[in-house]
């Protein structure tokens, strides 16, 4: 069966699909689905969501509580297509343009008297992370799916602000090398102040993973220099290497119940899982498994996991219907799962993939860890508070593994090895990176990172 819902997008047909020939820039893939994930990171109220809106035309703030307080709370997401005009007389950066993901593949160039057609170069998915310090765990979950990051720094405040440094540390943990720095709100400051802050930014990024990142002055509200961001996304962010031939695996970062109250029984739809495919290709009709699935406690206190088995009945990338989905941008997977299991993000942190091909479910981990020297983003009187204390037995920490956040207890520590007993089981594998946070002044603070050496498998 082929997709036909949008006449101006290229048609996908599962029968003609050859996974060995797919690339992240295959035309009938990027016509409908984003294949590169870019995160927006930075301090609270520095304009992350506004930049995403300026590039993609999509407002990522979806919840009333987010509107009222003007902050992002859940992970926002939006897709955008990036085009370049095929007329050689069309000068850069104006020849680059971005549009919503359901825009046709070769629109007319909008510059007066140009007459060229736009060529689709990239289809990107923005993961809009919260900048608020209390929401650090949400930001780390988003970092798990990023290929690159836009670091926002507001031009009307000194640099660095607390969460700016905390987010830089987080992307160093995730080993995210492709970074573009945006000096936002440039319309609010005089030229001398902007130059002075440019110096502060250069000093701040020295010795960090963002050391050689380009710095672009922009105004997201006035849409000033947005075309330059598009050009830099195309030129500075390499196309990630993707694995299309392995068994599919996807991490879930959002999940929904799409039914309205009062629906008739025959109208009820199954739950929807949103996330990013790490490897392999998902197709409509595939039999899938979700792990760890439903977690329950027995009477004797033993934890039991029942993986969920179901079929894929629809695939979407924003408003675009898909017949198959590839690794990269965020997609929605419509399933036959009971909607109550998916509502209000209940499936977040689970792993979805081919039946019997997913990693083990662990209840305890042995990790090789590294601690930061001092706490980031904490304003303290002296040096005493901000130093990171060593891990000790019976410490309670929070671990982020992929898009899962769970509490854990330190059972044993020796040099840079620790054994962690998890509060809830996770589906993971050896070699996966994890982030560690500790509770400081009622908030979780990033204290270090580690790598899973081995795990204790859950026995049902």
From Swiss-Prot:
As a subunit of eukaryotic initiation factor 2 eIF2, involved in the early steps of protein synthesis. In the presence of GTP, eIF-2 forms a ternary complex with initiator tRNA Met-tRNAi and then recruits the 40S ribosomal complex and initiation factors eIF-1, eIF-1A and eIF-3 to form the 43S pre-initiation complex (43S PIC), a step that determines the rate of protein translation. The 43S PIC binds to mRNA and scans downstream to the initiation codon, where it forms a 48S initiation complex by codon-anticodon base pairing. This is Eukaryotic translation initiation factor 2 subunit 3. InterPro entries: EFTu-like_2, eIF2G, eIF2g_C, eIF2g_dom_2, eIF2g_GTP-bd, P-loop_NTPase, T_Tr_GTP-bd_dom, Transl_B-barrel_sf. It comes from Dictyostelium discoideum (Social amoeba). It comes from the Eukaryota. Residues 219-221 are annotated as: G5. The gene is eif2s3. Residues 70-74 are annotated as: G2. Belongs to the TRAFAC class translation factor GTPase superfamily. Classic translation factor GTPase family. EIF2G subfamily. Signal peptide: none annotated.
């Amino acid at each position: 069966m082929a997709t036909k819902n949008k006449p101006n997008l290229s048609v996908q047909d599962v029968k003609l699909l050859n996974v060995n020939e797919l690339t992240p820039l295959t035309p009938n893939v990027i016509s409908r689905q984003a294949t590169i994930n870019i995160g927006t990171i930075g301090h609270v109220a520095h304009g992350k969501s506004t930049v995403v809106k300026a590039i993609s035309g999509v407002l990522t703030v979806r919840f009333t509580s987010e509107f009222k307080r003007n902050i992002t709370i859940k992970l926002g997401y939006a897709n955008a297509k990036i085009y370049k005009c095929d007329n050689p007389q069309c000068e850069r950066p104006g020849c680059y343009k971005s549009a919503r993901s359901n825009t046709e593949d070769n629109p007319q160039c909008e510059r007066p008297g140009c007459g060229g057609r736009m060529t689709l170069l990239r289809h990107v998915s923005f993961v809009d992370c919260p900048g608020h310090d209390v929401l650090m765990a949400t930001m780390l979950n988003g970092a798990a799916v990023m290929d690159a990051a836009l670091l926002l720094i507001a031009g009307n405040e000194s640099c660095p602000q607390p969460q700016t440094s905390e987010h830089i540390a987080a992307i160093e943990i995730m080993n995210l090398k492709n970074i573009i720095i945006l000096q936002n709100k440039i319309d609010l400051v005089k030229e001398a102040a902007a130059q002075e802050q440019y110096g502060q930014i250069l000093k701040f990024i020295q010795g960090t993973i963002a050391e050689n990142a380009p710095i672009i002055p922009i105004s997201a509200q006035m849409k000033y220099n947005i075309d330059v961001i598009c050009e830099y996304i195309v030129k500075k962010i390499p196309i990630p290497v993707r694995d299309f031939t392995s068994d599919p695996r996807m991490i879930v970062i959002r999940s929904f119940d799409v039914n309205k109250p009062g629906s008739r029984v025959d109208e009820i739809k199954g739950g929807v899982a949103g996330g990013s495919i790490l490897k392999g290709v998902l197709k409509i009709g595939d039999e899938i498994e979700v792990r760890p699935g439903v977690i329950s406690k027995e009477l004797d206190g033993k934890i039991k996991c029942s993986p969920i088995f179901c079929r894929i009945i629809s695939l979407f990338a924003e408003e675009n219907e898909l017949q198959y989905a590839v690794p990269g941008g965020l997609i929605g997977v419509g399933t036959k799962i009971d909607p109550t299991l998916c509502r209000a993000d209940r499936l977040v942190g689970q792993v979805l993939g081919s039946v019997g091909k997913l990693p083990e479910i662990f209840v305890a981990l042995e990790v090789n860890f590294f601690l930061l020297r001092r706490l980031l983003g904490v304003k303290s009187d002296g040096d005493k508070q901000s130093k990171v204390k060593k891990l000790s037995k019976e410490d309670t920490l929070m671990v982020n593994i992929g898009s899962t956040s769970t509490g854990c207890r330190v059972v044993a520590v020796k040099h840079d090895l620790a054994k962690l007993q998890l509060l809830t089981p996770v589906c993971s594998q050896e070699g996966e990176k994890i982030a560690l946070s500790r509770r400081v002044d009622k908030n979780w603070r990033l204290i270090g990172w580690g790598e899973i050496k081995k795990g204790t498998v859950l026995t049902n």
